[in-house]
Amino acid sequence: MKSLQIICLLFVLVARGSCHSCEICHNFGKDCQSDETEECASAEDQCGTVLMEVSSAPISFRSIHRKCFSSSLCKLERFDINIGHDSYLRGRIHCCDEARCEAQQFPGLPLSFPNGYHCPGILGVFSVDSSEHEAICRGTETKCINLAGFRKERYPIDIAYNIKGCTSSCPELRLNRTHEEHGNGLIKVECTEASKITPSE
C-alpha cells in the first residue's frame, strides 16, 4: 500500500508551468485548503487541481493536489488505468484562471467484464524496470499504456516510477526531461493496441 501512496503523489508531478500564483496544498481525501501559494515557474501556465484515486482491492484511497501545472497536463483532464490484480489508478484534472480550482469529482467505477484483451501491468516505485504481471482488460479498455519517469529531490538518487496497464484511450502527454535540482521528468509515454487473449489449448 505504501507504493500506491507514493505513486499517487508522484504522478501529478510529472509536468510542472508562468503567469501567476496558485494555491498549493496536498491532502488525503476529497478536499484541501491552504493560505499558501506558489509562483508558477516558467514552464507552468495554469493553476489546477488533481483528484487521484488508487485502489487495490479491497482497499482504496483518494488524494487531492492543488498547484501550478503545465497546459499539456491540463489538457489530459482525466485518466483511468487498470494495472491488473483488481487495481486501478484514476485521476481527474481541472485547471482554471483562478488561484483555486475546484476538483472534478469521480463517478463510480462502471460495472464491466473482461473483454478478451490483456496488457502488461506494473505499479512500480524507485525503478523504471519493475517486474510485470498480466492486466486483464475490461469493458472499453483496448489500449496498453506505459508511463515512466522520475522525481528529482534532495536524495542521492532520483525517485523513479513506472506505470503500465489497460486504458480506454491514449493520453496526449509530452516527454518532459528536466535537469532542474527539484524537477519532474516524464521519460516514457507509450500507448499501443492491447493483445487478444489466446485461448488455452
Curated annotation (Swiss-Prot):
Belongs to the CNF-like-inhibitor family. This is Phospholipase A2 inhibitor NAI. InterPro entries: CNF-like_PLA2_Inhibitor, LY6_UPA_recep-like, PLipase_A2-inh_b-type, PLipase_A2_inh_N, Snake_toxin-like_sf. Pfam families: PLA2_inh, UPAR_LY6. It comes from the Eukaryota. Coiled coil: none annotated. Expressed by the liver. Residues 1-19 form the signal peptide. One of its GO terms (molecular function) is phospholipase A2 inhibitor activity. Optimum temperature is 4-90 degrees Celsius. Weak decrease in activity at 100 degrees Celsius. Glycans are attached at N176. Disulfide bonds join C22-C47, C25-C32, C40-C68, C74-C95, C96-C101, C119-C144, C137-C166, C170-C191. Heterotrimer of 2 subunits A and 1 subunit B; non-covalently linked. N-glycosylated, probably by biantennary structure. Glycosylation does not change PLA2 inhibitory activity. GO terms for cellular component: extracellular region. Keywords: Disulfide bond, Glycoprotein, Phospholipase A2 inhibitor, Secreted, Signal.
